[in-house]
């Protein structure tokens, strides 16, 4: 039994390392799988695609790179891209260097004497920006200038781009992105854990070698529990939220027995494991602060979509290979209608906010309560209203949440105690983060005084702990309890509408990021010599005929051999046919 676990872990680790070969986990046929269609095959896509500048040239990663390549080939446009790059660099510059970096931008791009002067930024705006730079430079100083540049680029340059070979290439990538996704798109590895409707296992995309976690939702189990709306809700929220602090949905597909969500794989284990199983319970405050900042950024991204998470607890915060965290398991998350409040007594005992326990109407407030619980537990090594391994009834834990104050040990600095106290305020109207500014108010608390959130969001800060790349941070294969067989449930055509809403294939932004991160984009995005069209982009050149399969080649070779060996006289041929006919009948009657 131990051997089975060792084998499963060894195979998984080898896959995570890229298989040890030059292809880094890619299939031998990866270029064939990702072969561009001829541009003539993309005409339907050209007619139906939403021609929005921000979607095509800014939000979508491959679209952004191709628009950049287009601008670099047009005289006078390259400086606009360089300006936007420098503004992005300015926004993650340490505060003490903002003045010098801002002056560099003003001199190089916003001065009429400069050879790369950007005239599209109005002189009044330039004067205002220069004045603010001298008074007190801030991260958002050049935001309005950058917007002016985008306003220019989305005009004539964007329309020229739509008629260029770079946009044609983007259509080819979109065609690949929209190809059907099945279980054969992936290699499957060991089970990592259990979800509400089925197992979670590691998987790898054959074409790119990228590792993911596949969350299987068994169709019969969903139907038996009437969990269709819950499963579809989680899928749609994951699809919409594109955050580096929340697990991303990359693919959604179905098999005969299950619906599958293919998600960011988090190899470093969950916070519960690290709080309680790595030395003394709890973290040093510096480490707790780093995780709290990343969790806060994840909540901010969810709240931007008007989505409340409702299940913050250590088990749902996962670490990746590098030690960064992501919020996982959005099964209880819900989108709040604009200008409305919701009601629902859901969550985990000891982490539910007072307004949830009292079944009151609420907005985003339960998530700030949950953040307070997490910060407290990371520092103290136990949750604020329940001792470690304390056996206590649910009703008693709920009473403590509603009536008692949390106790702070010497482990807490004044700033840590203050932020926990303000986040764990019983009255949600008085709670930190529950005013109009939301997460921005929490970020300004002295606890985060030394945290540069811009650099954190840009992935430029090193985590305080890096998981061991040779470790598998999950239970042994045989210790993960298996689901029992669902009986008495039949699937029929009435379920097909739900399955079609769920099984939508690739999710654009994660899929495009995958192509870039695995260097498939770099290797395949090739044009003709000296900026000319490649054959697959040449409308006047017919597409290559598809390669014949193995069986076709074998059949053709056999047919040629038979033709060479068959006798030429007609009588012989008839005799051979008759003989075969006789043999066939003889065989049939024996």
From Swiss-Prot:
It comes from the Eukaryota. Residues 560-571 have a biased composition (Polar residues). Residues 572-590 have a biased composition (Low complexity). Disulfide bonds: none annotated. GO terms for cellular component: cytoplasm; nucleus; plasma membrane. It catalyses: [G-protein-coupled receptor] + ATP = [G-protein-coupled receptor]-phosphate + ADP + H(+). Its EC number is 2.7.11.16. Residues 53-171 form the RGS domain. It is a peripheral membrane protein. Residues 186-448 form the Protein kinase domain. Belongs to the protein kinase superfamily. AGC Ser/Thr protein kinase family. GPRK subfamily. This is G protein-coupled receptor kinase 5. It comes from Rattus norvegicus. The gene is Grk5.
